Regions:
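AAA+ P-loop NTPase catalytic core and its hallmark functional loops
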Residues: 1-158
């Protein structure tokens, strides 16, 4: 993950009615500036009100949100489009067979420092996402390997 410093808390409030186009008096926390992890806005995207409000509640109260549905129905895209309008960083992790516990947690890596090789811990996506305000989307959840799912379950329970 990038070493770019992310804002730690939303610094503005936006109108849900103006931003998402449906009746609501809710204001949602958002970021005034984009960074490299903010998805691109699809101006033609149509939001489902109930799903959008659930996602916004997750952002507002730092809660995990589970969105389920058939393959290809736009679950991940919905989260990304909400995040895009809030300038909220969003990272999608595909849980296919190529992801490992090391990718999630981190690993020791050999790096050069002052002309010498040293071993340094490089954190994975989970420690990084816990330390930063990020929407972490686990895609293809049912395809995750048991060892990977064990790590994710521990995070979801915390």
């Amino acid at each position: 993950m990038s070493s770019q410093q992310l804002l730690q808390k939303p610094d503005i409030k936006i109108s849900v009615k103006q931003t998402f186009g449906f009746e609501s008096g809710m204001k949602a926390g958002a970021f005034s500036k984009k960074n490299e992890y903010v998805p691109k806005i699809d101006p033609n995207y149509k939001f489902d009100k109930d799903t959008t409000l659930a996602i916004l509640a997750g952002f507002s109260f730092n809660k995990r949100v589970l969105i389920q549905g058939y393959h290809g129905t736009g679950k991940s895209t919905h989260i990304e489009q909400v995040a895009a309008r809030l300038n909220w960083p969003c990272v999608r992790v595909n849980l296919d067979s190529h992801i490992s516990r090391i990718d999630l947690i981190g690993k020791d890596a050999i790096v050069l420092k002052d002309g010498k090789q040293i071993t340094e811990f490089k954190e994975g996506i989970l420690p990084w996402s816990i330390q930063n305000p990020v929407a972490l989307v686990f895609d293809e959840y049912d395809a995750g390997r048991p060892d990977v799912m064990f790590v994710i379950q521990r995070v979801l329970e915390s």
